[in-house]
Amino acid sequence: MDEFDRRSWWMPAPDEAAWALPDDLRAVDPLSGRDCGWVNQMRPFVRHFSRPGEQVFDPFCGFGSTLLAAALEGRNAHGMEIDAARAQLARTRLARHAVAAPVVVGSLADIAPAAPIDLCLTNVPYFGCHWHGDVLPGQLYASSDYASYLTGMRAVFHALRKQMRPDGVGVAMVLVVVGGRVIPQAWDLGRILASLFTLREERVLCYRRPAATLAHAKTQSDRSHEYALIFQHCRARLDLQQAAQLLQAVQAQGLPVVVHGSYARWLASPTSVPEGPADLDLMLRGEQALWDRLTLWLQQQGFALSLWGEPCRAPVALAVVRAHHYLRAERIGADGRRLQVDLQLPVDEPPLP
């Protein structure tokens, strides 16, 4: 049986016939079960990132492969599935294995899960899969465009952050979809996860396929691999030296920023924040010219700006900042050191027209 180790890639063993999706269930699915994940691809992650009796959760549980894998490893499991027909297929499949794992119908963005979450393990829905089932709000398979697909994906993982236990681990498996050109689904999902969690690592799962010839200068592949993106519900500690230097430099620019949040509490009393501040939170009054000066200066210092994980460039309209509650600036040095700054308007600022 495969074990999770330091290998950056491996080839999961195909499922034993006993664990495969039964033909009668496959036959009634809108996609004929072609997107059903393997139980064996999930089991090494279950063993490595959870302990017996803990709760394994799949927010896109589909046919219940993750839940079955968790049960086989002695874990508790529960899932969510937005398509009611697929949720029933998962329940039927699990019942045939005498697995008691609740499957809630709905989206995690709208509905709370059935139990706490120690490990989130999932295959995310593919973009552009030509869904033939019921089209419901939040059904990512039915997304009409890539931007709305990514927005929906972010909503689910943002909700996950509120439900996951501190230091809990998540694994999201995703393909780089091709349709004549690459759609960087794995990297875009990684960007979303990195904005919400600490993105730790990746593994590449490869699946054996028969070799096939390719005409000269053609590029098509059999797409026989997927990425497992590993993230954790924790925040990296703030680099205190970099934060102090940046704050000094901002103040030297004559910008009237106000420090708040965990860094302000730490400055006032380091013992009150024994784990250290999580990030550098700065407030700046709602004058567009001041915000433009600060954000343009930060860009010149090597900071990348983003709104809820979406890259942006200065100047950024204050109405947009208010709608997102904060503007993030992050710099990654060549030595790997990171500095993250969250810029906010004062909470008592009047609404902008």
Where do the language-model regions lie?
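Active-site beta-strand termini and strand-to-loop segments that position acidic
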Residues: 231-234, 285, 329-336
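Active-site nucleotide-donor binding segment shared across nucleotidyl transfer reactions
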Residues: 246-280, 284-295
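Short glycine-aromatic motifs
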Residues: 197, 257, 298-305
